[in-house]
From Swiss-Prot:
Enzyme Commission number: 2.4.1.18
Pfam families hit by this protein: Alpha-amylase, Alpha-amylase_C, CBM_48
Pathway of action: Glycan biosynthesis; glycogen biosynthesis
Reactions performed catalytically: Transfers a segment of a (1->4)-alpha-D-glucan chain to a primary hydroxy group in a similar glucan chain
Gene: glgB
Subunit structure: Monomer.
Region (Disordered): 581-606
Active-site annotation: D306, E358
Cellular-component GO terms for this entry: cytosol
Protein name, per record: 1,4-alpha-glucan branching enzyme GlgB
Length: 622
């Protein structure tokens, strides 16, 4: 009896087979394994492996409609290595299974190229039932979302310098994230990638966790551990382009199957990778299924979609050397449709999922629902906020008054999409320096500036994201071959920075005023004090509010007045200059009472002492 049903073939040919991984690839049972592969240009497909001593001609697959091939091999069992042996145009070549659930480490290759391993993904016993039934709460758009971005291979190393495995990293990572109060971890791509220096963004095996850190059950254990600690997991996903390694997807069946046939569109000029042909139904099946695969089999809570702008524009980085769409335009209609369909199918099956877009242009409607013509993402990275805020924060305080608009004008578009504010890996590599090194001044001022930067990130509308190392102020920029500088975390200024970040996260998770990222959740009190480089704004959610007062100079400002809503006492919820965080302990002794002095359009005001390079978070007493 065939493994592929008539329905499978129908949905495959329509480009709507959203769980094609259940039919394609290798699927073992008690007596053997079913194999399925898409290779329409091939006139013969065989599977070779440990089970037939890698003999050509031993196990030939049957051709089905839609360019599909399938076959059953008795005796092929989990753990056996295998490859496809294809003939097209009179030539034979070998390919790794595009749907492989696991790939072997290259050092163990017994056959030219990278082999897949037959793998049963249903043997792991999950312990995250409580998380899976309640996760819609912490991931809702009206709730807190604070993400710790991690490159797993360089987060922490063993004593002899090796990266920690999925299992080894699970407990220490969960401890660290839980102690700091982040709601989610976002992993840079963990799908199989031959080139470690790509950070995972040049993928060969879209369905296989990279062998570098262990086996599939190891990754399941890591995610399970995080879930049991109440921490969500987001995976970086790269549906726009893929690695060119000859054993992978490139020229898979002797034709440009997964990539564009058009030479002007085929290669990505920035990364030297191949670009998926988003209009092909087989490619759409492959990518749509892959998005759901990570949620189905690995309990991933969401995907951060990489380089969306490079998918949306046919002329992206091509400087005039590109092919227009059927209407003569630059929009990539296939990519737009794929992204919309992916988001629709994800939210149909996982309404609580988090879909984030790294989209660096002003493309309209990234987070608008697809039924209203948008791409359908839940969040978009606010790249403009990241650029302008870091540009401002890196300037000497004496010059900041001349660049005051860099901070204020980000609010002019803050509500045009559902944004996430990313202080990401991209900002601490390639000569850009670490966040610590970007800050001006001596070590005390660098620490104070970073505390101030983080306060503004948590006060500004938008969800939060911080790349690893930023929590304690790593000195050197990130290097994927080296572990973080964990010894710094024990030094007073760096320890204080972590304490501050933890308290910001705690405040964020417990202050509904910070969850409302719509226009009615933000109110300027004073945005125009450029002479003193001070910003004052209020965050609101119903009758709950918090006031942020940010002093971007090292000058203590006495009797600094801000407008207040009525008569009453205000608590100093947080003060970044507290000695607990390594500051100079300048502040307002924990509280201040409003006076009947008009200011900023209010009948009452607060007389404050602003700490140097300091942030105050004030809350009205109940």
């Amino acid at each position: 009896m065939p493994h592929l049903t008539d329905d499978d073939i129908y949905y495959w040919r329509q480009g709507t087979h959203t769980h094609s991984y259940e039919r394609m690839g290798a699927h073992p049972n008690q007596r053997g394994t079913w194999f399925g592969v898409w290779a329409p240009n091939a006139d013969r497909v065989e599977v070779t492996g440990d089970f037939n001593d890698w003999r050509f001609g031993a196990d030939v697959l049957d051709r089905r409609e839609g360019g599909l091939w399938e076959g059953y091999v008795r005796g092929a069992q989990p753990g056996d290595k295998y490859k496809y042996h294809l003939r097209a145009g009179g030539e034979w070549f070998d390919r790794t299974d595009p749907y492989a659930f696991r790939m072997e480490p290259p050092a163990q290759n017994t056959y030219e190229g990278l082999s897949a391993l037959i793998t049963d993904l249903d043997t792991y016993t999950w312990g995250d039932d409580a998380w899976m039934t309640t996760r819609e709460g912490p991931s809702g758009i009206d709730g807190p979302l604070s993400i710790y971005e991690v490159h797993l291979g360089s987060w922490r190393h063993e004593e002899h310098g090796a990266s920690l495995s999925y299992r080894e990293v699970a407990e220490p990572l969960a401890d660290h994230v839980q102690n700091l109060g982040f709601t989610h971890v976002e992993f840079l791509p963990l799908a199989e990638h031959p080139y470690y220096g790509s950070w995972g963004y040049q993928i060969l095996g879209y369905y296989a966790p990279t062998f570098r850190y262990g086996d599939p059950e190891g990754l399941m254990h890591l995610i399970d551990t995080l879930h049991q600690r109440g921490i969500g997991v987001i995976m970086d996903w790269v549906p726009g382009h893929f690695a060119t390694d000859p054993q992978g997807l490139t020229y898979f069946d002797g034709s440009h199957l997964f990539e564009y046939e058009d030479p002007l569109m085929r290669e990505h000029p920035d990364w030297g990778t191949r670009v998926f042909d988003f209009g092909k139904n087989g490619v759409r099946n492959f990518l749509l299924s892959n998005a759901l695969f990570w949620m189905d089999k690995y309990h991933v809570d969401g995907l951060r979609v990489d380089a969306v702008a490079s998918m949306l524009y046919r002329d992206y980085s091509r400087e005039g050397d590109w092919s227009p769409n059927v209407h003569g335009g630059r929009e990539n209609l296939g990519a737009i449709s794929l992204l919309q369909d992916t988001n629709e199918h994800v939210y149909d099956e996982y309404p609580e999922a988090i879909m984030l877009a790294e989209e660096s242009t002003a493309w309209p409607g990234v987070t608008t629902p697809t039924e209203h013509g948008g791409l359908g993402f839940l969040y978009k990275w606010n790249m403009g906020w990241m650029h302008d805020t870091l540009e401002y924060a890196s300037k000497e305080p004496v010059h900041r008054k001349h660049h005051h608009g860099d901070l204020t004008w980000t609010l002019s578009w803050a509500f045009s999409e559902n944004y996430t504010l990313p202080l990401s890996h991209d900002e601490v590599v390639h000569g850009k320096n670490s966040l610590w090194s970007k800050m001006p001044g001596d070590d005390w001022q660098k620490a104070a500036n970073l505390r101030l930067l983080y306060a503004h990130m948590f006060g500004h509308p938008g969800k939060k994201l911080l790349f690893m190392g930023g929590e304690f102020g790593q000195h050197r920029e990130w290097d994927h071959d080296r572990a973080l500088e964990w010894d710094l975390a024990d030094e007073p200024l760096h320890e204080g920075l972590m304490e501050w970040l933890g308290d910001l996260n705690h405040l964020y998770q417990n202050a509904p005023a910070l969850w409302n990222d719509q226009e009615d959740g933000f109110e300027w009190i004073a945005y125009d004090d450029r002479e003193n480089s001070v910003l004052t704004y209020r965050r609101l959610n119903g009758d709950r509010s918090l006031v942020f007062v940010l002093n971007f100079t090292p000058v203590v400002r006495e009797d600094y007045r801000i407008g207040a809503t009525g008569d009453g006492r205000w608590h100093e919820r947080l003060n970044s200059d507290s000695d607990v965080y390594g500051g100079s302990n300048v502040g307002n002794r924990g509280a201040v009472h409003s006076d009947p002095v008009e200011k900023h359009g209010h009948s009452h005001s607060l007389s404050l002492t602003l700490p140097p390079l300091g942030a105050l978070v004030l809350e009205p007493a109940e």
